């Protein structure tokens, strides 16, 4: 894979990806670029279209993790020219335990099945096995009918609202939240890209993120605490974890005001 650990500090100066530094990481050993479309810690929207073009110029395929982008912005995998694009169901208001893998047909044809079972085999004998056509060769056994139906309904729901409308509304909320939270004494926000997603990670003074999250929960305010499955990034920033507020299409400015008031109330306890 791309040796991101070698140059993470250079690539992510200012907590935004630098394309010229990114290109320096390619070598003859690079086999796949795997990158998040939107950071689930910083909210940074990575320039994946340009990253894909660079990788393809080196003959390297690209997998985009779209878990943090699919619910929040329009996505056109053909325009991006992504070889693979993946996302989880629950991030887009669907059920847990299900997700989507998009792949270019040329790549999916090359890849072997990762599971064996009913429907993924066309013919089988003791001497030879012929796998089924796409997409069935990757769908062994009884499918998750309930999960797939619920996920399809969730995608229909956000599509009916309009992804452009969702993106514009959430950007307005994010700008409002960033400005409001910066007014709080001792506030440190991690990830301040100009065009970022609605993910705001922060610490306040010397208050431990677990303490802040627990007390906000007592006030009826839902946030996430910890390293958010991004422990190497936390080490790079010299912290153990953050409090993370995540904005969605259902949030309001009044709720952001309640979050800010809750943080201020908790801060007075320390």
Predicted features and spans:
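Single conserved hydrophobic/aromatic residue that forms the stacking wall/gate
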Residues: 1-12
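Hydrophobic beta-strand scaffold residues
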Residues: 6, 62-63, 189, 223
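Active-site phosphate-binding strand-loop segment of PLP-dependent enzymes
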Residues: 14-67, 71
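PLP-dependent enzyme catalytic core of the Aspartate aminotransferase-like
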Residues: 24, 152, 213, 218-222, ...
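Active-site PLP attachment segment
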Residues: 79-123, 127
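A short glycine-threonine-serine/GTX helix/turn-capping micro-motif
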Residues: 121-125, 130-145
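Conserved small-domain helix->loop->beta segment predominantly found in fold-type I
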Residues: 139, 158-208
């Amino acid at each position: 894979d791309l040796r991101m650990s070698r140059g993470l500090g250079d690539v992510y100066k200012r907590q935004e990806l630098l394309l010229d530094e990114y290109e320096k990481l390619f070598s003859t050993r690079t086999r796949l670029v795997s990158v998040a479309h939107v950071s689930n810690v910083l909210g940074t929207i990575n320039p994946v279209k340009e990253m894909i073009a660079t990788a393809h110029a080196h003959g390297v395929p690209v997998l985009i993790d779209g878990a943090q982008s699919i619910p929040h912005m329009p996505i056109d995998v053909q325009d991006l020219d992504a070889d693979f694009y993946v996302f989880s169901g629950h991030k887009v208001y669907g059920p847990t335990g299900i997700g989507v893998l998009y792949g270019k047909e040329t790549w999916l044809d090359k890849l072997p099945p990762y599971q064996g079972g009913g429907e993924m085999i066309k013919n089988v004998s003791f001497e030879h096995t012929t796998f089924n056509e796409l997409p069935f060769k990757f769908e062994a056994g009884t499918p998750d009918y309930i999960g797939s139906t619920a996920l399809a309904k969730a995608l229909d729901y956000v599509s009916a609202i309009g992804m452009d409308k969702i993106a514009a509304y959430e950007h307005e909320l994010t700008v409002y939240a960033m400005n409001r939270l910066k007014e709080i004494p001792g506030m440190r926000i991690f990830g301040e890209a100009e065009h970022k997603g609605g993910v705001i990670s922060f610490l306040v003074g010397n208050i431990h993120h677990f303490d802040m999250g627990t007390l906000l929960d007592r006030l009826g305010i839902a946030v996430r605490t910890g390293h958010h499955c991004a422990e190497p990034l936390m080490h790079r920033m010299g912290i153990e974890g953050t409090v993370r507020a995540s904005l969605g299409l259902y949030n309001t400015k009044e709720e952001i005001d309640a979050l800010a008031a809750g943080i201020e109330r908790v801060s007075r306890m320390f």
